[in-house]
């Protein structure tokens, strides 16, 4: 865990895909406030983080990250107006929540039967690289696709930049990140 080697810690390595998933669901990030620290491991980079994120659509997201838990888990809980969605947080699938057990819980006026009916019509898709290559294949064949684009990658890196910048400055950082951001070319500490 060095700045020279990995060039980032838990934000860059362990939680980046969860944050990408949040952006896929809610759209672009508007701003982030981050507290990062190293508390558990003898490394240079962060191993713990607490993030407060506001999405462009107004949704609020909190994210807590630690490399000090007894078990490696990725757990998501997403609360909509009439639906709560929870991943199982299985230690058997810490880096693949898509293949974990999920709960979709209705809240009035939506009924659980309505939710279950919608879920029964959803096709399972592949995850990891198999899923990525399926989406690229769809795009190449002229079909609608959820392939990851260069814009997605840029927005992900801008989010990481905003997180590191926020932690160092102690303030909210708004996205998108431009060339005027002091961390635009490097996240390495001074």
Feature annotation, model-predicted:
Residues 1-42, 170:
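Predominantly a Rossmann-like dinucleotide-binding segment in NAD(P)-dependent oxidoreductases
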Residues 12-15, 147-153:
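Conserved loop-to-helix N-cap of the C-terminal "lid" that shapes the substrate pocket in Rossmann-like
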Residues 16, 64-72:
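Glycine-rich phosphate/pyrophosphate-binding beta-alpha loops
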Residues 18-19, 129-134, 160:
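A general structural signal for well-ordered alpha-helical segments in protein cores
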Residues 44-48:
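A short, glycine/Asx- and small/polar-enriched loop/turn
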Residues 77-151, 173, 178-190:
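C-terminal glycine/acidic-rich active-site capping loop/insertion
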Residues 159-169:
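Short arginine-rich
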């Amino acid at each position: 865990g060095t700045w020279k080697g990995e060039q980032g810690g838990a934000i860059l390595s362990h939680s980046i895909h969860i944050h990408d998933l949040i952006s896929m669901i809610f759209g672009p990030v508007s701003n982030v406030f981050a507290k990062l620290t190293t508390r558990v491991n003898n490394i240079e980079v962060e191993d713990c983080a607490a993030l407060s994120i506001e999405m462009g659509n107004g949704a609020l997201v909190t994210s807590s990250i630690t490399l000090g838990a007894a078990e490696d888990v990725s757990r998501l809980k997403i609360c909509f107006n009439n639906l709560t969605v929870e991943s199982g947080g299985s230690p058997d699938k810490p880096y693949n929540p898509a293949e974990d057990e999920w709960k979709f819980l209705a809240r009035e006026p939506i009924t659980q039967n309505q939710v279950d009916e919608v879920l029964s019509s959803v096709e399972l898709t592949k995850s990891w690289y198999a899923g990525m290559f399926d989406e690229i294949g769809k795009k190449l064949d002229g079909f609608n696709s959820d392939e990851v684009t260069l814009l997605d990658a840029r927005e992900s890196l801008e989010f990481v930049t905003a997180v590191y910048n926020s932690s160092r400055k102690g303030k909210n950082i708004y996205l998108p990140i431009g060339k005027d951001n002091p961390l635009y070319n490097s996240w390495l500490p001074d």
